[in-house]
Design a protein with these regions (language model features):
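N-terminal pre-domain/capping segments
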Residues: 1-57, 61-80
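Hydrophobic alpha-helical segments and helix pairs
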Residues: 78-109
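Conserved small/polar residues in nucleotide/adenosyl-binding loops
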Residues: 110-116
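Alpha-helix C-cap/termination motif
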Residues: 19, 87-88, 113
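Flexible, active-site-proximal loop/turn residues at the rims of small-molecule/cofactor binding pockets
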Residues: 30, 99, 116
């Protein structure tokens, strides 16, 4: 069984080692801003970690919305987050799909699957 925690991004390996965990989740950019993550300075340390790393995407992402002014930047931010996460071997990116609002399930399903199929 994997044991882990959502921990601060800075000194993540030291933090999870202190907690005796083998799995952790971090933010790689501010969770409440539209700014894309930058390449990690500690990429080699993260790549050498013998455990599971997950990245939590920013909270602002809403790929389910029919509003293009929100959905399009959400797709870009999700793609950029996945790209940086892949550079150090993250096992996955956790993302909340967002709110559909008006438009129904069919619209939201299309909006949710398009960016994930594009990123993957």
């Amino acid at each position: 069984m994997n044991i882990g925690a959502h921990i601060p991004s800075k000194n993540a390996i030291d933090e999870i080692s202190y907690r005796k965990g083998d799995t952790f989740q971090i933010f790689i950019s501010s969770p409440q801003m539209w700014k894309s993550p930058k390449p990690r300075e500690d990429i080699e340390i993260l790549q050498d970690f013998d455990g599971n790393i997950y990245v939590h995407a920013p909270y602002l992402i809403n790929v389910a919305t029919p509003n293009n002014k929100v959905r399009h930047p959400s797709r870009k931010l999700l793609k950029d987050t996945c790209k940086v996460a892949s550079t150090f071997g993250a096992k996955g990116v956790i993302v909340h799909g967002g709110s559909v609002g008006e438009g129904g399930d069919t619209v939201s399903y299309t909006h949710l699957t398009l960016p994930t199929n594009t990123v993957v």
